[in-house]
Amino acid sequence: MLILIVGYVIYSVVTKAGAIENAKSVLSYPQAILGMTAIFVYVGVEVTIGSNLGEYLKETEGLDASQISKFVSLFWGSMMIGRWTASISNFNPSESLKKILIVVVPFVAFSVVLIANSLYSGDVTDLLPYSAYIGVMILAYFASKEKPVRLLLIFTALGAIMTIIGVMTTGKIALFALISGGLFCSVLWPSIFSLGTAGLGKFTNQGAAFLIMMILGGSIIPVVQGKLSDSFGIQQSYLLAAACFAYLFIFGIIVQGVLRKQGIDFDKEVVKGGGKGH
């Protein structure tokens, strides 16, 4: 049923993706409808990965509550790592300094996570291999060139790949792959929000309000994963998270086409505006 609903939304949007004249409401804009579904899915996947991680660790690793906390903390810390990285451009550093900071800041943030966990959990040496996943995020960020659509496509593709790795493998590789979903979720909100409200004109504020309403996905998608976990097991239930990342990837492709039909090439507009798409 969910697949049918998503398919209908995409079909409806694509069929009216041309230039909009005499729009009577924000819902006349395909990008707004797509943005609403994307925010719903984005918040849902962000919350579901973190909220079900404790159960995953109990079932697959046999850990108790005192051991679980540092891994859950690492997931939410990953959100911080990504957001600190994305915020660098807001300080207007020179290009050479920015490149250095994009490499250094994520590991500074990771150090903060490690220190905080060491104060509570003691030994955190088993978290150190996660630095490899941070390295992947840094390379992805450079590859995105800070363009919202490009960043969205790269990060959602990696999020889907890492989640599938988490489902198909075992041990720390699987665990860290799932936790890295936090890294690849961390910078999606501003990209989705910017794309969903692009070209809305006088309806921009209304569109923003509609998008914010869709954070209710964070209360629905985790419940769906819980039901899947009951039927198929907690590890397999994370395929739902992979599907969410895949939908966000598709959103990026479709909304870019929708905006171009309206005469808006979003990534080019960002470059003209100084490269600060988020």
Positions of the model-derived regions?
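Interfacial helix-cap and linker-helix signal at transmembrane-aqueous boundaries
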Residues: L57-K58, S89-N90, Q225-G233, S237
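Intracellular juxtamembrane helix-capping segments at the cytosolic ends
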Residues: G50-L53, S186-K202
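A late C-terminal transmembrane helix in Major Facilitator Superfamily
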Residues: V167, L183, T197-F232
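Multi-pass alpha-helical transporter architecture, strongest
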Residues: S118, Y141-K145, A242-H278
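C-terminal transmembrane helical hairpin of 12-TM major facilitator-type secondary transporters
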Residues: L97-I192
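Symmetry-related core transmembrane helices of the 12-TM Major Facilitator Superfamily/SLC fold
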Residues: M1-V9, V104, Q235-Q256
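Loop-to-transmembrane helix entry
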Residues: G62-G77, K99-V104, G122-Y130, N205-F210
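Extracytoplasmic gate region of multi-pass secondary transporters
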Residues: K24-W84, L114-G122
